[in-house]
């Protein structure tokens, strides 16, 4: 993985931002860190890294002496919490030092990522698309848009998107749909999440599913040499979510603890109150609560995920980066051509997620250990979601940010920062 990252930096050497050079030279002058350049670093890394044996890596442990060790614990401060004493910590450390621990033996799943695929799908049509893209239509109905760019050499981004999302489910199942991405904790195909991480060692590739209000999607990225692996992972995301009850139970417990810690933050109560008022207590606008975790039934989560990714022909695929339509075509017919397809195409449903109408002034009081005040102003109005309007909103946001920084912070000293944000959101009416 290290050599792969070095190679990626070398391939993108002509696209490095000025800030990266500045940071490197600052470290060079202040910390005497060498700055030989990526050409030298790549050559040196490929010469040195293969010569470092595992034994040499393990010898690093000998550099950690028993004396001069520092231990730090970060624990929540709350009533009823039992904290370890200094002696208990030292005793636990001594017990570990005295143990005879067997060397770790790594088990690797050497099975192929996907089974042998024999697709009869062909390229039905390849034509020029919009904005310089190539539109490839497969004989199974899947459409693929390919755009070659040189902005980031050796990098490829993928997105597959389909209409539907959580809008097709009732409010009572919103949290289930919103967390259906949790299925990836079990891994894909024949590989657990841990085994898959080992299998992908040395590769720069990722594919992750998501389910939003009106869409479901896959988001992928890779370097050029790992394009086929990205398509293999895409195939698994559609066909083979893996069930792992222990991993899912552990994830729910971590989620539950994280939400409990959030509940202890006074700002969380403020955010919950604001969301409730602004969106008329719409469950789709509220965050998941600790008590909601118990309702995330694994069977139903798996079922919903499979429903959303059951028909690949309902998705449009986009590949952007260091990739050509002609070179990717054989991989598309092999992997996307092997996906389950149907003639039915879904549409998202209209779900009322609009902000409350009218002017409201709300004041929330909550006792805090460190008293502070927060003022939040929210404005909304109907406006066309066009490119021009999005640019204008961005310009307005940046201008107001500069204005408030100069007046409220620098001139008045009234606040450290006054964040400003703005966006346009589509709310389909049919």
Predicted region positions:
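Peptidyl-prolyl cis-trans isomerase
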Residues: 52-60, 242-243, 248, 296
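Amphipathic alpha-helical segments in well-ordered regions
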Residues: 2-5, 335, 399, 403
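M16 family metallopeptidases and their MPP-like homologs
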Residues: 1-50, 69-76, 145-147, 152-240, ...
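Conserved short beta-strand edge segments in small beta-sheet-based binding/regulatory domains
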Residues: 244-250, 342-346
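Proteolytic maturation boundary segments
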Residues: 11, 15-163, 168, 303, ...
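Feature representing long, continuous alpha-helical segments
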Residues: 55, 177, 390, 394, ...
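Conserved alpha/beta enzyme-core scaffolds, especially Rossmann-like or related mixed alpha/beta domains
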Residues: 308-310
